[in-house]
Amino acid sequence: MLLKLENSSKKIHNALQEDLQMVEATSCGGVVIYRGKILTLYKSYKNRYEGWVLPKGTVEEGEEYHETALREVKEEAGVQASIIKYVGKSQYSFNIQNDVVEKDVHWFLMSANSYHSRPQREEYCVDSGYYKFHEAYHLLKFSNERQILEMAYNEYLDLRKSNLWGNRKYF
C-alpha cells in the first residue's frame, strides 16, 4: 500500500518552476508494539519540527530495508524489536536549501521484547513511550504516520484474533 501526502505534487511542481534540484531518499521505520501499546518518540529538530513520530531513518549503503528499520528502532529508542511483517510505503517531500527531497519510507510491523525504551538525544529524540492506539494516533505529528499506524495496528489486531501474534516472524 502506498500513502502520499497531498502537497507532494505541489512541491514538485514548485521545484521545477524555481530551478530546485530533486533529490530522492529512502528511509525505513517500525510500528513497534508491546502488549498492545505503540512506541512513539518525541523528536525536536532544531528549526525544522518538533513532535511525536514513529521511529525511522535513512537506509545505509548495503543495508536491506528490514535491517534499516530494526537498526533505527534500536538507535532512536533503545528498543530491541523483531519484525513481524511489512506494512507498506509512505511518501512525502520537503525542502532543504536548494533541494526538494522526495522521500519514500518503508514501514514494518514489529514486536518489542519489553516496555523499556531509551530515547537517544544524538538522534534528536527527547522522550519516548508506549501508548494505547488512540493515544498514539492523536499524538503523532504527521498524517502519513497516522495512516501507517492505523494499517499496522489493524494487522496486529488480525494477528491477535487469529492467535498468531508473536508466533511468526518474517525476518
Predicted regions and their residues:
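Thr-Gly-centered strand-to-loop micro-motif
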Residues: 54-56
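A conserved beta-turn-beta hairpin within the catalytic core of GNAT-like acetyltransferases
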Residues: 46-50
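Entry beta-strands of beta-propeller and related beta-repeat scaffolds
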Residues: 37-38
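Short loop/turn segments immediately following the C-termini of beta-strands
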Residues: 43
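Charged phosphate-binding loop/patch that engages nucleotide di/tri-phosphates or the phosphate backbone
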Residues: 5-14, 138-171
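Acidic, metal-coordinating catalytic segment for phosphate/diphosphate chemistry
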Residues: 2-29
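Unchanged
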Residues: 59-147
